[in-house]
Amino acid sequence: MIVDCCQCIGITKVSTYSTGAFRPEGRNDRTVIVVDIRESETAKLADIFIQVKPGGDYALFNALRAIVRGERDIIPDTVAGVERSVLFKTADILLGAKFGSFFTGIGLTQSRGKYKNVRAGIELVDELNRHTKYTLTPLRGHWNVDGTNQMFSLAAGYPYAVDYSRGIVHYNPGETSGVDILAKHEADAVLIIGTDLGAHFPRETVAHLAKINTIVLDPFISLSTAVAKLHIPVASVGLDAEGTAYRLDGVPIHVKKAFTSSMPSDEEILTRILQEIRKIKAERK
């Protein structure tokens, strides 16, 4: 809940509750830097806004990494539309922090370079950790997005783009991710669970979804259900089904159901599908 008014009645909050041990002034003790291709609402709240040219993420990360490594002489006058002096100032702020955190959005994966842009960011964070403490957290939308990555990492050792078709786990982003497989028209059947590919995947991949056997497990009607051959309504975890959700920072949270409905959960549907597949395979032997 976010409020614009807070009343303290019968209590002196400042003297009763302790402030942060390391950042007693809260927001005033923190420096927020926003990097984006345009001035967003978040950028207006930042202390420093760096406007980068579209597709310049990879170059920007590597320029900052070079500065952190002490290679200032090799930096050109501008990198991805950002002046050299701004890069030096930013690097000095990053190095001067006692504890810093990077938050990356899905925009990094939408430009040329895709996952390599994220890797460049991780390498910059790794370089900064040689001097001080830094973390990196991906910011993604929707409910429990991190849950799938956690389960894939646990079962296969990789967070996404996992291919089992070879009989062993194969991981190669750019070849085995959902977008790549659909773009190359390799898939003739797709099972979509709790997400909306129709709203977020490229147009040509969504067009392919409409041509093949697409099945959607979702509590709601979406752009994916519009192109699907079959839509199976399911219960919504946290409302009429219980389960485990992973917070943005990877912390698992068990959620209880608020009420009981007649809708089956994702787990129930997938279990029944798995049982039927095993039954069919046994009959074919």
Q: Each PLM stretch: what is its role?
A:
Residues 1-133, 155-285:
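Non-catalytic alpha/beta scaffold blocks inside enzyme catalytic domains
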